[in-house]
Each structure stands twice: as C-alpha cells, then as structure tokens.
Amino acid sequence: MGEDFKKTGYLFGGNAVFVEELYKQYLANPASVDQTWQEFFAGIKDNNTLLNKSTAKIIIPDEIKKESLNNNLSSEDLNSLKAKEMINAYRKHAHYLANLDPLGLELRKTKNDLKLNIETFGLDSGQLEENINITDEFVGTWNCKLSELVTKFDKVYTGSIGVEFEQIENVAGKNWLYNKLESEVTFSSEDKKTILNDLVEVEGFEQYLHTKFPGAKRFSIEGGDASIVAMSKAIDLSMHQGVSEIVIGMAHRGRLNTLTKVVGKPYKAVIADFISGSVFPDELNVSGDVKYHLGYSSDRTLEDKKIHLSLADNPSHLEAVNPIVAGKVRAKQDILGDTKRSKVKAILVHGDAAFCGQGVVAESLSMSPLAAYDIGGILHFVINNQLGFTANAADTRASRYSTEFAKIIAAPILHVNGDDIEAVLKATNIAVEYRQKFGKDVVVEIICYRKYGHNEGDEPMYTQGKMYNIIKNKLTPGNIYANELVKSGVIDNNYFAKLKEEFKAKLDKEYEQAKSYKQEAHFLGGLWQGISRTRTQATITGISKKTLHDLGTKLCEIPKDFAVNPKLVKLFEARKATLTADQPIDWATAEQLAFASLLASGTNIRLTGQDSGRGTFSHRHSVLHNQIDGTTYIPLNNLSKEQAKYEVADSNLSEYAVLGFEYGYSLANPKNLVLWEAQFGDFANGAQIIFDQFISSSETKWLRMSGLVVLLPHAFEGQGPEHSSARLERFLQLAAENNMYVTYPTTPASIFHLLRRQILDDTRKPLIVMSPKSLLRHKYAVSKLDELGENTTFLPVLDEVTKVDTNNITKVILCSGKVYYDLFEMRGNNSNIAIIRLEQLYPFEKKLVASLLKKYNRTQEFIWCQEEPKNMGTWCYIVSHLNDALKEAGIKNEFKYVGREESASPAVGSLQVHNKQQEKLLRTALGI
C-alpha cells in the first residue's frame, strides 16, 4: 500500500477487491446488489468506465469517482465504504503487524509503515465515536462505533494470529475464514485447566527423558509444546465432525511426544526403547530403526465416538513421508467408499526449513487437488522454531514466511505465536473446520523456538548465541499459561505444581514397568492377516484358456456409438483375431489379460504414471478417447457388473511424490494391485529417496510390507544416456534379505505371471520390473496362450528354447532382457551356443540355475552378456552368484563378462556409435 494506493484513493485502489467483485456482480444482475450500490454504479457513465479484462480491475477516472460519490452517497454511506476498505486492508496486510515471534527477535512493522491508520482511508480521529453500519456479503455485518471496529480488528489481526487468505480463489471459502477468525472464541475454566494439563504432560515427558537419559537423542519439542496440544485438539475436533481415521506424518522433532500424547503409545513402551535399545522383538531378526522414526497406531475414544490413529514410519529424509501419508489416506478412503473424502484425513507436521527447502513439498502440494490424488485436503502444521539445524531463517529461505509453497494450491495460511496456546487452538479449530467443510488443504504455522540444539547433544550457542541467551531465560509455554490462569483466577498458585508432581509420579511408575517391558511387533493385522513375511511355495498363476479367450474378447469390444481413433479400431480387431486364432500374444495383451483376470476375481487395480493410460510407447491403450466429444471408455472397467475397479491415471510430471503416493497407497490393503510406471526408467532416480528409504527397506526397518509394482522401461536402443537405463544396478545393490523382486522379463507370459503372483502369493514384496520398449512390438517377443494357461507359473529362468544336443554345446551365454533377442537373431542356426535367460535377477534362484548349467557340464566357456556398461547393469551383482551356481553344478569354471566397457554415462548419444558398440558386444559374445 504505497504511492500507487495513495494516488488511486481510499476506495478504488488496487486493494478494493470487494468493489471489483461487486461491480462484476452488478453487471451480471443489477438487482443482486444493494440499492445504494445500484445507484452508485448507475451514476458512472459507461464510456468512462473500463473493466480491465486482464487484471479484473475497475478503472474509473478520478473525476468520475468524485462526482459519483458526491452525488450518490450520504456521509454515513461514505464512511461505511471507507470502513469497508479499512477492513479489507486489515485482512490483507495486518499479518505483518501480528505479534508472532515468542522470542521478540523480529522488528515488527507499525500501522504507519503499512498505511493501516484510519487517515489512509479518509477517516480521522474526530470520527472515532461515529457509528459505522455495514451489511455486506464480503466483509460481513458491522454496527458499532468506528473506535470499536478499529479495536476489534487490531485484536483479531495484529495479536497472536496473522493470516494470509487472499490467495484463495473461492470467495465463499475466503469469507468463511474471515468470519471465523473475526468471531470470538472462549474457553471455559475447565477447558483452560485441560489445556494446562496438556502442556504439563508435553513438557513433563520431555524433561523426564532429559533427566533419565541425559545426552540421548530425542529431538525435544520443548519451545514448540503448543504443536502437540494442537494436534491432539485437531483429532478431537475431527471426531466430532465424523472422521473415523487419521493418518499422521511428521519428522523427528516432537515425535516421542506425538507417539505418546497424541497417538497413544504407552509411556513405558517408549521408555523401554531407551532402556533396552531394541524396538522390536529379537526373534524377528530385523534391523529396526531409531525410536524417533517409528510409527504406531491405536484407537482413541471421546464420549461415544472412536477414531483410529496412525503415525506413519519415516526416515530422516525430511518431508519424504508427505506423499506416503496422502497415498495411504486415499487408499483407506477408497476402501470405505468415502467419495466425499470426509471419513479419513491426513495431518502432516513440517519443519520450517524443510517445508520451504524440500522439493517434494511442492510436488506433493501440486498433485493434491488432482483427481487421482485428491484426499479432500490435508491439515498441515508447520513447526517454525526459526532454525534449520544451525542455519538461520535468512539462510534457508528468501521469503518472509516458510509457508510460501502452500500458495501453489491457494491454501489458507494461519501464522500463530506458539507461546499463546489459546490462539494456537483457535487457529487449529478454524483449520480443522475449513478442511472438513471445503475439502482443501490448510496450513497452521506455529512460530516457536527450540529449547536445545538440533539434538540434545548439540551446542546451539556456537551459532545462535543471541537467540539462546533469550531462550535460556525464557518461561516455558506451560509456565506462561499457568501464570495467566493464576492471574485470571482460574487456578491458585499450588495447582500447577500439583499437576507436575502427579504427572512425574505417573512417569516414575511407567519407568519401573518399562524395565521388564517386552517389545511388541504390531504388524500383519487387520486387512494384512494371512500375509506371510516369506513365500511358502511356488504360486500357480495360470488360468484356463477359455477364461483367457473370454476376457480377451471382452477387452476388444468397443461401444458402437463410441468414436474411437480408426488406428485403435484396427489394433483391437487385430488383438481379437490373434486370440480367436489361438496365436501368440504380445506384451500389451498379456498385461491386459493379467489385469482383467485379477479384476474378474475381485482385485482392485490402480496404475498411475506419466502417460500410463496410453502408455509411453503407445502400447497399452487402456483408456479410449472419443474423437468427437472427448469422453473416455475403459474396457477393463466394462468386463462385468461384479468385477473390481480398475483405476488408471496419467500423473503430473513428478516421480518423487507420485511414486511416494503409490507406495503409500499399497500399504493400506494387500489385496489391491498397485503399480507405478515411469515414462522412461531413466527418470526413476528422481524418486531415489522413495526407493532407498521406503520400498527397499521398510520391512526390515519398520515391519511395513508392500506389494507395489514398479514398471521401468529399460533397454539400450540408441536413444542416448537419458533414455536407455533404469539404473538396474542400483536396484540390485538394494536387494537383500528377500526384500523385493528385481526382474527383467523378456516374454509376455512372464509379465502375466509376475503381475498375478503379486496378488496370489501369500507374501507381499515390491516388484521391480525392467519393462520393454522395442520388445513391445518385436516379432519374437510373444507367448502362446498355453504359457498362460492352467497350472502354469512364473519361470525365473528360461533355458535354451531350441532343441540342442547338450554334448555339442561349446558356449553357454546367460543374459537378461532385450539383448537376448539380439543374440538370438545373430546366432541364427548355430547349434553350438546355448542362451539362457534370467527373468528374475533377485532373489537369485541358485539351485534352478545350477540344475540348468549341470546339463552343460562339458561346456568350456560360460559368458554373462549385457548391454549396460560393466560398472552398471547386472554384472557386479551377479558374477559371484553365477560362479556359485557353477560350483553347485559341479563345474570347475567361471563366468566371463561380455558387454560395454566401464562408463561414467549409461549410454552414448550417437546412434551410429551405439550400433557399433552393440554389434561388437554381440559378436564377442557369440564368437563371430
């Protein structure tokens, strides 16, 4: 509100949003606005009034303004208009005046700085006792003295809460928020005592751990105590609004208090973690994780209501858990048929530096309103302790607030002083109601401080001496509130001390019980009952040929009145003809048959990824688009009335958040088949944190299993270093302890069985698939229906396909993926070379490989052939396994490597060079 504002006057400046909106409303229907406004707008000559379409601002010459105001408005109406503009200015800008910093380090602006004094709006001190009468759909109804109005708005907007709502496009939602904020909230004496008790327990538990286990890392929430109370209050409010389940995601700070105070983990269980150092029973033989990464779930009851609470496990990688929580919530909503997204909700707790520093925050926020990822809004708490480890706020962001990312989705933001617990709870109440009423994200930023260093063993005085000199002499939030209650007569001087003594006694009892407490493993319950951590037997995944024919034919049916692209008509006719003639099928058909068979038996399927509806390589076409009206038709959802649901969506251009969301979705129900597909496998490393910290390790760290399928197009076809490699070697490096399947299938039958195995198996492991590109249309990359038929199963190793005399074999080549077909075609009729394929690389089937190699015990040369450079692909992982298999087969020999030389880049950029390299490695492998 600078010079431009003063030039354009108090009414029609850039801040007069309500006038602009009212004017547009008047143009649409004059009778829809107040009579005074009708006269005012009618008094403006049309040829002198412009509505700038690009900015949606009213442009009215000054002389017209003055003439219209003088002719059409009484002094009372004019003062009301001025007061309206003042109200709007407060709403937009007064957050800069709010008392948000409990440490008082910030130099606050004044009303004069922001031009929020009454003189700016054409009012003066002589009018303070005049009555203001406002009835307006935008600013509400006000009938009071001007002085009372100013006092009211000073209290609301320049106190302990500062708000940013102007980014909200929904006028109804924005007005609702302002009205809620401007409404008084009162707490009864009993409410106040309960709040004080909550603060005592939050601080008391932290101090108890600090005393009993000095120096142990716990990432105390002290200084931000209000955040724990706010979370707990949000849950109680949600229960009253009909929410039946909440999933919480957060980082390490304050987690131990969240586990106990909010989620309901027994204090003795957390204390036992400190005493024993073990978080899971030893007999499970898992790595476990540090105590401040662990999740927990329980039920909370309030009066006659019950809610299920889950705190998601997470790593130290800040904000990584955000999309996982969202995906899990969406899955639970889908299980309940909660299409209104009102029964299950998410709460995410962020740190200030992480919220504005981690890209996954922006990715997750951007995807949240999209149909495939919408969960009806998330309640966000940002715990702003004004530091990022040792970095000051100025080092971690350029913006005033840490919450700017939230404006990507026009989320309302409430900033609140963490020392004012009642203000924190008022903001929380508004946020909870807003999320439930409007189904949108909302952010509550609690500005607080961190009592200790980043952890309890860290010395913050090295880098923040000024700040910590203030903190060490500061009253805690609990003490501040207790003093307020004593002053107001709610409690006496002894009440606070008694609360602390009683809670300390409770913790002493919990400590004694913790000494003999046996850790429990809470997993494989609910929908996961019947799932095993290990496979008990090979799973038959084939189905009858009749079923394959019936499903395949149904998939090829297109409604007569649906104007599909003519090329797709031919494609579907060709698929149908192939099935009818019992001819070998391609990859896309096999995938669709796997999906269809699972849907028919009641398994819901969810597939997302960039371009997944059609498929990057135009092979899937599971969503048909009407060429005339743009409507869609999904054959997989039109198999029968009794079938399960097939959900396919083209994701936003994100790997990290989208993969995280699908991983989270897979955690909720093991009976769902959940898939994420990369556009090219090369881009999967944009989600490396999800692979490293969750998919590969969540079972051993947190006892969390997942059956997620990851499809990564991978093959060296001359498309350059960014469209060739899914970095297969990285997945093999992550593979251990039977934590996942890593596969590089070459046949349609293999993908058919792999997909079905994910559901029919009695265990759940992530499935990593190096999926094909050119093989999607390769003449040899086909499978007979018999290979998908009854009593068939996935074959992790495929022997030489031609009939050979093993006594004549002079060379055995093992390989995986597309290079097999290159070798097969170049070999031709050479009957002295056998080629064996590994369809599954991990777990390595040593006994099966050894049994095949034993047939070739007279062979002198064993080769591993791959397209990838030697330092990439499979070689480094598999060489020891292959040689062990040779030993088990009784063959005294070792495998030799044939492939590209070591390289810093996965592939060359030149097609010509690629072709030369490919021919060289093929000829070397075949010895021609």
Swiss-Prot record:
A Pfam family (short name) is: OxoGdeHyase_C
Reactions catalysed according to its record: N(6)-[(R)-lipoyl]-L-lysyl-[protein] + 2-oxoglutarate + H(+) = N(6)-[(R)-S(8)-succinyldihydrolipoyl]-L-lysyl-[protein] + CO2
Instruction: Provide this UniProt record's keywords sorted from A to Z.
Output: Glycolysis, Oxidoreductase, Thiamine pyrophosphate
Checking InterPro entries in the record gives: 2-oxogl_dehyd_N, 2oxoglutarate_DH_E1, DH_E1, KGD_C_sf, ODO-1/KGD_C, THDP-binding, Transketolase-like_Pyr-bd
Q: Which GO terms describe its biological process?
A: glycolytic process; tricarboxylic acid cycle
Q: Report the coiled-coil segments.
A: none
Q: Recorded E.C. number(s)?
A: 1.2.4.2
A GO term for molecular function: thiamine pyrophosphate binding
Give the SMART domains listed for this entry.
Transket_pyr
The record's Gene Ontology cellular component field reads: cytosol; oxoglutarate dehydrogenase complex
Q: Where, by residue number, does the polypeptide cross the bilayer?
A: none
Uppermost EC category: oxidoreductase
- Identify which cofactors the protein needs according to its UniProt entry: thiamine diphosphate
User: Is Kinase given among the entry's keywords?
Assistant: no
Q: Report the protein's function.
A: E1 component of the 2-oxoglutarate dehydrogenase (OGDH) complex which catalyzes the decarboxylation of 2-oxoglutarate, the first step in the conversion of 2-oxoglutarate to succinyl-CoA and CO(2).
Quaternary state and interactors: Homodimer. Part of the 2-oxoglutarate dehydrogenase (OGDH) complex composed of E1 (2-oxoglutarate dehydrogenase), E2 (dihydrolipoamide succinyltransferase) and E3 (dihydrolipoamide dehydrogenase); the complex contains multiple copies of the three enzymatic components (E1, E2 and E3).
Q: Which family does it belong to?
A: Belongs to the alpha-ketoglutarate dehydrogenase family.
Identify the NCBIfam families for this entry.
Answer: 2oxo_dh_E1, PRK09404.1, PRK12270.1
For this entry, the protein name equals: 2-oxoglutarate dehydrogenase E1 component
